[in-house]
Amino acid sequence: LWMPDGETLVIANGGIRTEADSREMMNLDAMEPSLVLLRRDGTLVSKEQLPERMNSVRHLAVAADGTVVSGQQYEGDPLDHAPLVAIKRPGQAFQPFPLGEDVRQTMRQYTASLAIHDELRLLAVTAPRGNSVFFWDLDSATLRQQVHLPDCAGVAAVADGFVVSSGQGRCRLFDCRGERIAAEPLALPAGLWDNHLRLA
């Protein structure tokens, strides 16, 4: 994704080499996931890693102020305490976002997607293994709400909040303007859905 300056690319390096046909992960013992900032001319600005080597940096969202948030998928022991969401605020290091242990356990070592709502200063993260979507205040890192949605995956910011899709063909609009986040179903054309979401 491009940073707000239009000159810097932010890259999530998952660190996993996958065999093309079988999709088998080939290098779990030598993973080096990272968050990279790269200038348009190819100059490396920064390369930062989280402490857990098997924590694959997979998904990114960038706020208008240059805050970068990443979602991880942990390939190690299911009982390990890996940071599944991380944040890089302008001028600061790439570091774990404070989830809370109950949230981390609900995620079951896997995030699918995330999005930032710049006007409302909210972060939305989907966790399909935990059948949950989470909404945080981006500035205070306070959890606003957790909502049950089976196999939720895609998420995108819209005027009033977020749209979230699922691998089961469900789609919800979450209105985040009030104190409580309200959800309403959205109708999708038959057969036109996916685990990823981009709104135009």
Regions found by a protein language model. Give the residues of each.
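Short coil/turn segments that connect the beta-strands within blades of beta-propeller domains
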Residues: 7, 65-67, 119-121, 159-161
